[in-house]
Amino acid sequence: MKKFKKIILWILGIVASLGIIAYVSVTNHPQLVVGVIQSFMYKESSPNSYSPLYDPIDGLKENGQYLKSEIAYSKDYPNSFLDITYPDQNLEADRPTLFYFHGGGFFGGSKNMGDPLAASQSTYLIDDIVSKGYNVVNVDYALVPDYHFPTPVIQMNQAIAYIKEHAEEYHLNMDNVVLMGSSAGAIMVAQYGSVLANQEYAQLLNIEPSIAKEHVKALVIDDAPLDYAKFSLGTKMLVGNYVSETIYLSEEEINAYNPISHVNKDYPASFLLGSEYRTDMVSLNKALKQAGVENELVDPLAEEGLEKPHGFVANLRTDPVSAKAFERMMTFIDDRTKK
């Protein structure tokens, strides 16, 4: 019996040791796990490409909206392509311009497929925003493992600069702009808000804003994980991998990543949506209130006792709570762009 006990303890010791080794390995190198997910998503292709994934389109969609797709906005980084969707073929009509940045944990997603982490169809969301009278610029950006923070924010700035330079060509009003992002894209938008408002933060990221703050009428920040210290292990692995290829970020790296501590009175008016990362949105909401910044938070758990999935607003066609959140969002940005 003692012999068997020793064998069992020996086996348990080996299993525990292997578990510790595995934990240390994946937390220090989360790309080991993220890379496996990417291999299933992209198979033999790469998540980053200097060529567009699809043939360019310049014409009417089935729903009557007009699409110009696969426009290269820079040659500096891969995935530097954007699409522009207009409500109809009257491209010269003066409308607000909304930039949209997709989610995907900085390892997946695209302007065409939306956010693979969200239980929703974000491409419908784009169409429904366009139908409300907005020209929407839908932007792609580079992903891990080749590119890390703050590269996507730099690309965001490049996309805005490109459209500003070509505004007349594409009939886009760059004096009346909304920036919107979901999940990873919401992180970028929240960070860009602090870039616009806070020169020290802009210098920290080495980004010179390509648009004047007064021309950005509103931000829409859809469920952005921002407060690194409060993240679950899974979220730390995704964000840590994006920032520095490890979950063990330095204080300096966390300070650069989290825009909440850099909020001031000049931060743009913001509409916040909270579900999986509602506590982060509550923290941002409080910081904006303290700074005297106009903002509104949609928090279904606090307001209606309902837990909604990540990126829930994109379910507006099938879920009444999402539809109501969408209408509140549109009212918020309409009030700042159409009056």
Predicted segments, located by residue:
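Alpha/beta-hydrolase superfamily serine-hydrolase fold, recognizing
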Residues: 3-339
